[in-house]
Amino acid sequence: MTPDKDNSVKFITENYEFVVPFFDVDSMRIVWHGHYCKYLELARCKLLDKIGYNYKAMAESGFLFPIVDMQIKYVKPILFDQAILVNATLVEWEYRLKIKYVIRDSNTHEKLTTAYTVQATVDASNNRLQLNCPATFTQKVNHLLK
C-alpha cells in the first residue's frame, strides 16, 4: 500500500450496478443468500479489469488466486427488481488480495450488505502458495495509485 502526501492510504475501487432479476430470488422475492457471492464476483471482475490484471491475465502470468476467506454481513434483504450498486475496493495487495465490498440500494444509497474476500497467490505450475503477489500485479496497482 502506498500512502499519499497527507499520509493516508489510497485504494482502487470499482462499482457494478444492476437490477436484481427474478431468477435470483426465492419464494419470498428476496435474493437467495448464495447469489451474494456471485454479485461480489461480478464487482471483483470489474475491479480486476480496471487494474489490468483479470483472471485471464492471472492465468497467463502463471498464477492462480483462489478465495481463501470470505465474510458476508447481511444488513438488509435485497429484493426482486431492486436496483443495487456493488462497490469493490482493493485494500491489500502486497501479500494477498483483500477486497472489501459494500452493496447499496442504487436509488436511496441505503447499505444492504458488507463483505470482504481474501485471495492467496498460488503458482499454477506446482500449486504452491506464494508469500507475495506477483510483481506484474503490484506494478499495475502502484501505477494506478500514482
Predicted features along the sequence, with ranges:
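Generic structural detector for well-ordered beta-strands
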Residues: 17-21, 73, 118
